[in-house]
């Protein structure tokens, strides 16, 4: 895998899955920008990779996905073509309904709307690359949470942390379907489920829930279950979608464990898969319009 001369942006690339993605892309020769709310948090990674003497240069820039002004500033400051955009940053299961300053529910703002704004803001740079790729980190949580167009921000329905998270991840998958309109520009967009991994993503999950998931004992010790992946293993599918020549021209798909996932209709005994509601072209087009209107009103 040779990415020499390619330029990449990885959101949330300072730790966890994002950091492993940055390491892999930089090792292959890509010039990588870590887009993070606190650029100083990425300094250890930047220094680590500089000391390693890899081919790809790594830098960090400020980006707050929940703030449209921050996203616009990042996109406006970008110069030249962009070959790879990895929409990796995310938050999960905020215990109470939290709103971004413009009124967006925070999980939807960070996980979907912010990335939609970033991708559309960088569209010209992606187009100019000739064969750019957008990689969207979704989650199996999308399976049971279709996007609610009537009350996406929980203004009227009771707030549920996991429904809010799942809805935002369903939106991520729908974005890949809606982005088929960019295929003529040479831009492919695919989503993935990285699997079960313990990272800072779980920082808002309370101890009771962690115990119910089986990953915390009575003494408060966190222990991954046998089927959990390491961050490096979880990032493998992101790197595959970002760099593998086998996926040239492939767009609007959902992957897990380095292969395209099967489509499922709802809850099934067998885990995994991608929900049919997240691949619905009509819902994808409707969401694209929803996102465009939301950005216009922000």
Swiss-Prot record:
What SUPFAM superfamilies does the record tag this protein with? NAD(P)-binding Rossmann-fold domains
Source species, domain of life: Bacteria
| Record: residues binding substrate | 139
Q: Where is the active site?
A: 165 (proton acceptor)
Enzyme's top EC category: oxidoreductase
State the InterPro entries in the record. NAD(P)-bd_dom_sf, Sc_DH/Rdtase_CS, SDR_fam
Q: Name one GO molecular function term.
A: oxidoreductase activity
Gene3D superfamilies with a match to the protein in the record = NAD(P)-binding Rossmann-like Domain
UniProtKB keywords: Oxidoreductase
Q: In which residues is NAD(+) bound?
A: 9-33
Q: EC annotation?
A: 1.-.-.-
Query: Which family is it part of?
Result: Belongs to the short-chain dehydrogenases/reductases (SDR) family.
**Which protein are we looking at?**
Probable oxidoreductase
């Amino acid at each position: 895998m040779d990415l020499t001369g390619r330029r990449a942006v990885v959101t949330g690339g300072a730790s966890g899955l994002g950091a492993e993605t940055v390491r892999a892309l930089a090792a292959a020769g890509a010039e990588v920008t870590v887009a993070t709310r606190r650029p100083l948090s990425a300094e250890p990674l930047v220094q680590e990779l500089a000391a390693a003497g890899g081919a790809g240069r790594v830098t960090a820039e400020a980006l707050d996905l929940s703030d449209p002004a921050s996203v616009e500033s990042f996109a406006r400051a970008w110069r030249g073509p962009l070959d790879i955009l990895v929409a990796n940053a995310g938050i999960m299961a905020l215990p109470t309904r939290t709103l971004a300053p413009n009124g967006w529910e925070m999980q939807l703002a960070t996980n979907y709307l912010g990335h939609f704004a970033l991708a559309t803001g960088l569209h010209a740079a992606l187009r100019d690359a000739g064969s750019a790729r957008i990689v969207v980190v979704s989650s199996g949580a999308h399976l049971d949470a279709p996007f609610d167009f009537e009350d996406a921000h929980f203004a009227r329905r009771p707030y549920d942390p996991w429904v809010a998270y799942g809805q935002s991840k369903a939106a991520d998958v729908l974005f890949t379907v809606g982005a088929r309109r960019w295929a003529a520009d040479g831009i492919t967009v695919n989503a993935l489920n990285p699997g079960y991994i313990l990272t800072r993503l779980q920082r808002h999950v309370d101890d009771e829930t962690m115990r119910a998931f089986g990953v915390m004992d009575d003494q408060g010790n966190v222990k991954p279950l046998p089927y959990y992946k390491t961050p490096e293993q979880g990032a493998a599918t992101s790197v595959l979608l970002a760099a593998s020549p086998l996926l040239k021209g492939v767009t609007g798909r959902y992957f897990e464990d380095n292969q395209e996932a099967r489509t499922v209709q709802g809850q099934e005994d067998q885990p995994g898969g991608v929900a049919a509601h997240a691949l619905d072209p009509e819902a994808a087009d409707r969401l694209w319009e929803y996102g465009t209107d939301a950005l216009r009103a922000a």
